[in-house]
Amino acid sequence: MRHVVECVYKSLNHKGEELCGDKVEIVRTAGSDILVLADGLGSGVKANILSTLTSKIIATMMREGAPLEDTVETISSTLPLCSVRHLAYSTFSILEIAHDGRAHLVEFDNPACFCLRNGELIRPSFVKREIAGKEIHESFFQVELGDYYVLVSDGVIYAGVGETLNFGWTWDHVADYLRQESKKRPSAHRLAHQLSAACNDLYMGKPGDDTTVAVAKVIPASRVHLLASPPQDKKDDERMVREFMKDSDIRIVCGGTSGNMVARVLEKPLKASLDYSDPSLPPTAEIEGISLVTEGVLTLSKTLEILRQCVTDTGEVENLDLLDGNNGAAQIAKIILEKCTHLSLYIGQAINPAHQSPDLPFDLSIKARL
């Protein structure tokens, strides 16, 4: 099975707290992708320390191939029960998806994972195991392309309790929401931000608990090649373009000189597009065989600005609307954030004298800094 697991998470801090009591770890190994969500008891600094310890221990031991029993026993011996409330200092969920599609889900006292396939909720069978005095729910199943797996802390299912809702959002209501949203086939990034924003709305902007959403989406591998500057020596133009055209699903060319070079080598016409609505950026263009052709420095600078606004931990869900803009920068950002699993950059050392002095070294060029 040729797939990639896109993992994204979004957290809301308990109102009045600087630190989140939930912690997410994402681990990539040679054979699998591991997503860990830990929820520390309470909130603030104490909960943050407890969840960080739990998630780090799990992630490190799972990465090294330790058995589940050893991992849970290590956590139990490191973080004992609370002497007052007799509760575990931290709850956790672990999702490991192997590169052949086999999945292993382990849950301890966190809300059950939401598993969605083709817009419907699926419920993998699980077994209960007792390890080091803890009741663990464990599932083994096979994933498919397009599946979503959503891990949440209890702040999600209790969103709005006592405020907008008497008993909170509840697991079933969250499942209904995710089922409807998943039918739109959003990226993991969008789904995580949308669910987090919905929880924040139910809390009326003042979360009564740390609230974390971690989404894993199984997507096909997609290789994106981006060419942003021609070689310093024109003799290398053809070699660069030929390499750029190899083994890629999406091809992006940035810059007028780069576009002319690609069109010349491919012997295809370069056609400017008149369909754009953002006067602050130059219009895009078209070359047969190229997914997107844009202007260079201005467009790339705006692309970075959009990406920073979308991926920052404090970013709002409204920032994702920037990805739908009708301009080259928005299109590049959307491809990188939502369609790209492997990105290759083709950056030649030619300097455009219209942007800066050609006497300056390439390391100081605008594109190199971008």
Model regions: which residues?
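Juxtacatalytic helix/coil linker segments
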Residues: 1-37
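Acidic loop->beta-strand submotif enriched in PP2C/PPM serine/threonine phosphatases
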Residues: 17-30, 123-162
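Conserved beta-strand-loop-short alpha-helix elements that form
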Residues: 30-43, 107, 142-165, 216, ...
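Active-site beta-strand/loop microenvironment that shapes enzyme catalytic pockets
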Residues: 240-266
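Catalytic core of PPM/PP2C metal-dependent serine/threonine phosphatase domains
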Residues: 20, 50-119, 136, 188-216
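Primarily the active-site beta-strand->alpha-helix module of PP2C/PPM metal-dependent phosphatases
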Residues: 23-76, 150, 162-172
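Short, hydrophobic/aliphatic alpha-helical segments
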Residues: 25-27, 31-38, 141, 193-197, ...
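C-terminal catalytic subdomain
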Residues: 158-242, 246, 268-272, 276-356, ...
